[in-house]
């Protein structure tokens, strides 16, 4: 039998989707004002949502 890949992780898409939006980055900074560097970094996330 062929080994099957997990269907919920689609290559080419954001792999973190499998863990839900609460995993990592978003949760960490959600209640603090962003520094300038983080704000620059955040533009990419906003576009994806």
From Swiss-Prot:
It is found in: Spore core. Pfam families: SspO. GO terms for biological process: asexual sporulation; sporulation resulting in formation of a cellular spore. Induction: Expressed only in the forespore compartment of sporulating cells. The keyword Secreted does not apply. Residues 23-49 are annotated as: Disordered. GO terms for cellular component: endospore-forming forespore. Keywords: Sporulation. Belongs to the SspO family. This is Small, acid-soluble spore protein O.
């Amino acid at each position: 039998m062929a080994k099957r890949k997990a269907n919920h992780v689609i290559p080419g898409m954001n792999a973190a989707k499998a863990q839900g939006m609460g995993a990592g980055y978003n949760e960490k900074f959600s209640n603090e004002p962003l520094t300038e560097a983080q704000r620059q970094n955040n533009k990419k996330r906003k576009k994806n949502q």
